[in-house]
Amino acid sequence: MYAIFQSGGKQYQVKEGQTIRLEKLNVATGSTIEFHDIMMINDEDNIYIGDPILHNSKITAKVIAHGRSKKLHIIKFRRRKHFRKHQSHRQWFTDLEIINVSY
């Protein structure tokens, strides 16, 4: 059984027991969080599709850790003009463990 839900403007496909990395959520480490913006649930026998979301359904997850991803380097360069520009970025993330998918 898997579900597709929306968080932070992105959609994720998850199963029970799976670990997933999302954009940073302002929730304490070790606490549980519920997602109600579920778009689709695929049970072994049935497929439930929302219009646009499924009502009376939720995904329960446990917050494992917060952190920052590897550094991403952005380099701008113009040939023959002696122009080089360098920037870096590290994105915050939250790791979750999916506990339960219910509908």
Swiss-Prot record:
Gene Ontology terms, MF aspect: rRNA binding; structural constituent of ribosome
Keyword Membrane part of the UniProt annotation: no
Protein name according to UniProt: Large ribosomal subunit protein bL21
Record InterPro entries: bL21-like, bL21-like_sf, Ribosomal_bL21
Gene for this chain: rplU
Function field: This protein binds to 23S rRNA in the presence of protein L20.
Highest rank taxon of the organism: Bacteria
Native species: Baumannia cicadellinicola subsp. Homalodisca coagulata
Example GO BP: translation
Keyword Membrane appears in the UniProt entry: no
GO CC annotations on file: cytoplasm; ribonucleoprotein complex; ribosome
UniProt keywords, alphabetically: Ribonucleoprotein, Ribosomal protein, RNA-binding, rRNA-binding
Similarity-based family: Belongs to the bacterial ribosomal protein bL21 family.
Signal sequence segment: none
Subunit structure: Part of the 50S ribosomal subunit. Contacts protein L20.
Pfam families xrefs: Ribosomal_L21p
